[in-house]
């Protein structure tokens, strides 16, 4: 497949009107690179684990970070801004992750989508963790869905790729969704340069799309198994996984996420730092490619903090659990 065919395949996968591929280190960088969030716009985001990316990437834009992914928090922070769905703007942007932020929060995208349209806001969803397999964010109310393709490419992409998908604007009974129409017009007019992929890169992405459902189900299933193991581990506290009833968004997640509850688990260590745990683990837990088959750990609050975020691979969860257990007890 060439780039256009891959973009069309991704649009079909994401239920989108159109999709674009671009190179970017992560989703906020891709949104900035598009240039559709302009000086004079207001960008309201729930991204407490990615605040620096929003502080640096949107010069001239009024950026406000909210402490909750609720529609009420976004609406309150948007009061007084005279937003428009006209292409000229000014535009009000709402940004959330389908799974993200500290605690792996799952926002009610349906409620956010409704509230965004009432406020004349454009809802953008970072769908990287849940993926198009695990969350149909455009159907739920987003006008733009952005997804870093590390996991889609099974960790084999030679550079960081992001897919940008725009919602269909045709609603039932021939009504037009003004928010989606505005987002499409902005994407069409952003002047994004023609994107090129090498034959190897195109092959990696094509094979990734072909095997996506099977692999993502394996990631989700292993995450649940590891979450249940960690929930019973006496060396761990404050486990956060949307699939457990203890998670604050569990009820919402059952209606937002599909095929499970995503590949990520977050937890805090008792009486030791994340760096100390990494010292006791094989290097592959830290250095394996993002989105690949090997379970990977990260430190969202730094190595001196106690918070660990686990992204389940497709490797044997019994072996992963045994390795973690040994490191936690030594």
Predicted segments, located by residue:
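N-terminal "arm"/small-domain region of PLP-dependent enzymes with the aminotransferase-like
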Residues: 1-16, 306-315
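Conserved PLP-enzyme active-site core in the AAT-like
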Residues: 5-235, 246, 327
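Conserved C-terminal alpha-helix-loop-beta "cap" of PLP-dependent enzymes
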Residues: 235-326
């Amino acid at each position: 497949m060439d780039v256009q065919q891959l973009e069309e395949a991704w649009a079909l996968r994401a239920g989108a009107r159109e999709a674009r591929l671009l190179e970017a280190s992560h989703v906020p960088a891709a949104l900035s690179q598009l240039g559709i969030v302009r000086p004079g716009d207001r960008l309201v985001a729930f991204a407490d684990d990615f605040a620096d990316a929003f502080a640096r990437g949107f010069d001239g834009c009024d950026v406000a970070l909210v402490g909750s992914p609720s529609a009420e928090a976004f609406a309150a922070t948007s009061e007084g801004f005279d937003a428009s769905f006209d292409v000229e703007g000014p535009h009000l942007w709402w940004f959330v992750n389908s799974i993200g932020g500290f605690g792996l929060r799952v926002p009610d995208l349906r409620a956010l989508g409704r509230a965004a349209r009432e406020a004349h806001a454009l809802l953008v969803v970072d769908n990287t963790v849940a993926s198009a397999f695990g969350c149909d964010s455009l159907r739920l109310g987003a006008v733009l869905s952005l997804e870093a393709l590390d996991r889609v490419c099974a960790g084999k992409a030679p550079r960081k790729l992001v897919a940008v998908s725009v919602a269909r604007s045709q609603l039932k009974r021939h009504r037009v969704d003004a928010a989606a129409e505005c987002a499409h017009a902005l994407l069409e007019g952003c002047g994004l340069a023609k994107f090129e992929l090498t034959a190897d890169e195109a092959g990696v992405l094509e094979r990734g799309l072909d095997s996506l459902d099977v692999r993502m189900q394996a990631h989700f299933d292993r995450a649940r198994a590891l979450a249940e193991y960690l929930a019973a581990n006496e060396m761990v506290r404050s486990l956060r996984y949307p699939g457990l009833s203890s998670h604050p968004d569990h009820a919402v997640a059952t209606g937002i996420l599909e095929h499970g509850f995503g590949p990520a688990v977050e937890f805090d260590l008792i009486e030791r730092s994340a760096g100390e745990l990494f010292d006791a683990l094989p290097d592959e837990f830290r250095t394996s490619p993002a989105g690949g088959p090997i379970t990977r750990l990260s430190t969202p609050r730094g190595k001196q903090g106690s918070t660990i975020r686990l992204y389940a691979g497709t490797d044997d969860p019994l072996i992963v659990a045994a390795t973690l257990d040994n490191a936690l007890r030594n």
